[in-house]
Amino acid sequence: DYQNRLLNSNDVYKIIKEKNITTLMVTHDVSEACAFADIIIVLTDRPTHVKSIHKIIYDKKEDPINNRLKPIYNIYCNKILGELNVI
């Protein structure tokens, strides 16, 4: 369920940060990417190429659950959803 997904995401994030592991995560979930990532690369449809690159900057980087509570989180999500012609 969604609640467990959020908690698992937080656990993975903490492990990555504690062990200082560079990670490439592929997702179709814009909200997850905006909460989790330092950089988001948006791809086009086939043939795939890079459409845009976004550096995600929070005043204080926290875990994904707390990042979702920040006002800038919605700005990042809306910008990327707009690029994808969702909103």
Language-model segments: residues:
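Helical segment within the ABC ATPase nucleotide-binding domain
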Residues: 5-19
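Extended, non-globular alpha-helical segments
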Residues: 1-2, 75-87
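Conserved beta-strand-loop-alpha-helix hinge in the C-terminal portion
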Residues: 45-76
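Conserved H-loop
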Residues: 20-26, 29-35
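Conserved catalytic segment of ABC-fold P-loop ATPases
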Residues: 35-42
